[in-house]
């Protein structure tokens, strides 16, 4: 039994020494790319679009055309960094009756020669244990 341990010990030591170089370098608090189709990214994008429309002074809703890029960072919760393309819809805002994301996504676009698209950079901070999500940044 002892001879097996003595033979295995150098191999285990070698494995432990090589393992860190085989793993990608992860930085605590660093930004990491995310799949734009990830459900958490999709949820953050929906939150960003709803809040963008609530804060926008435009008379019409803007809907998500696509998520161009998504990253996340662990910071007392998760902060999502999203680059999104939005398009102005034909749906008019009605005071006191905001539309939810899925309703906005169902809105039609104007004819192609009248379409207006914008690229936005959003930061969405999610802290699920507090049941709190905040749009911390929206820039055109």
UniProtKB/Swiss-Prot annotation:
CDD domains: CY. Disulfide bonds join 91-107. A motif (Secondary area of contact) lies at residues 73-77. One of its GO terms (cellular component) is extracellular exosome. Expressed by the venom gland. It is found in: Secreted. SMART domains: CY. PROSITE patterns: CYSTATIN. The record marks 29 as: Reactive site. The keyword Ribonucleoprotein does not apply. Keywords: Disulfide bond, Protease inhibitor, Secreted, Signal, Thiol protease inhibitor. InterPro entries: Cystatin_dom, Cystatin_sf, Prot_inh_cystat_CS. Residues 1-26 form the signal peptide. Residues 29-129 form the Cystatin domain. GO terms for molecular function: cysteine-type endopeptidase inhibitor activity. Inhibits various C1 cysteine proteases including cathepsin L, papain and cathepsin B. This protein has no toxic activity and its function in the venom is unknown. It may play a role as housekeeping or regulatory protein. Belongs to the cystatin family. This is Bitiscystatin. It comes from Bitis gabonica (Gaboon adder).
């Amino acid at each position: 039994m002892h001879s097996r341990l003595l033979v295995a010990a150098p191999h285990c030591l070698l494995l432990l020494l090589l393992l860190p170089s085989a793993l990608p370098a992860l930085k605590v608090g660093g930004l990491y790319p995310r799949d734009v189709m990830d459900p958490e990214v999709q949820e953050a994008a929906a939150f960003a679009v709803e809040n963008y429309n609530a804060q926008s002074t435009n008379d019409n809703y803007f809907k998500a055309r696509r998520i161009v890029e998504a990253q996340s960072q662990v910071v007392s919760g998760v902060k999502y960094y999203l680059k999104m393309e939005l398009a102005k819809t034909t749906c008019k805002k009605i005071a006191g009756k905001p539309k939810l994301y899925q309703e906005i996504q169902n809105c039609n676009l104007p004819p192609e020669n009248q379409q207006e698209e914008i690229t936005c950079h959003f930061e969405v901070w999610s802290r699920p244990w507090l049941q709190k999500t905040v749009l911390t940044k929206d820039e055109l």
